[in-house]
Every structure is written in structure tokens, then in C-alpha cells.
Amino acid sequence: SVASCLFALCMQSCFQDMDHPAFDYPESTGEVPTTPLKMYLPFDEEDIRDKGEWGFLVADNGNAKFAEDGIAGMAYQGAENAYILAKTPSILENNMPTIGDLTVAFWMRTTKNTSAQGLFSIPNSIKFWGNFDIFLENNNSETQAFFKVHIFNQTAKENDERWVEAKIDDIFGSEWVHLAFVYDGNTSTITVYRNGEG
């Protein structure tokens, strides 16, 4: 299983489990906050609530587990059938360029994966793939991770969809690694940083 501070933002309307009715989310105001930290999940005391400025409504799907030896306190421990779901504000659903620059950063400690894992997604309610998706693919390496990032609705009209691949050394093992996926809204490019180095 993956022991990490990973989370996934998924659109709840993609599925409906009749044993677990749909979440009762309030409507988004449609206004983009001006503060830089939109979402923050520190997982203190096994708390999955968002401490960022947007106050995403976060729910546990699959009985979330936590590890006590996180980089600073508790860490979310993902599993095949357990993930965190945060309701995406309507402002983010179908128009990626309006948010400008975006950084998704987290600490991760995991062993080598044997199948693809979804790490993060800003969904798109019109298309199959989301506006911004991060996947950890199987790379057949004991230490090097293979990330695939999907970007949709970029600024270049002739190329509305793009996949970016990044192979990053020294990810798997017993040490915590800080990863940052930085999206530049002006150029529609992604840069991946490992422990601050690109």
C-alpha cells in the first residue's frame, strides 16, 4: 500500500453508490480567492478537512488510514480502494486557463508501484479526462518514478489537450520526498520538482 500524503480531487458526479448517497455540497460562489494557498490538507489528528482558503469539502471514500510517522505529524495512507474526495468548485470544472498558475505539492513515501495510481485531479464535467490530472505509472524501476500529467483546455487553441511525462529518480524507498507539479498558465507548461530541484 502507498503511505503518503496523497489525495485525489475527483468529480463526485462520475459515480453514485446507492449505499452511500451523493454528498450534499453547497454551491460554489464562483469567485476565485486571491490568496495563494487554495487547498491545504495537513492531516493533523487524522483530520482530512481542508485548511486552505477555499475550504474544499473533503470526504473519505474507503475508510482512510493514517500513518503516525509523517514528515510533520500524521500522513494519509492511500490504498487501492481508499481515497480522499474533495468537491471541486465550479470555477475550476471546465475552464483551466482562468486559474492562471497552479502548484500541486505534497510529501510522498512509498514503495515501487505495480500499477498506475491516480494522485490528483481537477475534473472536467464535459470531457472524460480532467483539466489537470497527475498519475503515477508503473515504470519497472525500484527507485525511479514515472509520472504522467494530463492538461486540458490550455491557452493554445490548436492543442487543447496534452500529456506530459516525467521520470524522476530516487522516489521509491523509505525516505520522504517532496514533489511539486508546477503549471505555468501563461505558457501551459508543467515543471516537476523533487525536493526543490527541477
Model region roles, listed by residue range:
Residues 9-13:
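C-terminal motif of bacterial Sec signal peptides marking the signal peptidase cleavage site
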Residues 150-178:
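Short, aromatic/His-centered strand-loop micro-motif at the edge of beta-sheets
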Residues 194-198:
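Short, solvent-exposed beta-strand-to-loop segments that form ligand-recognition rims
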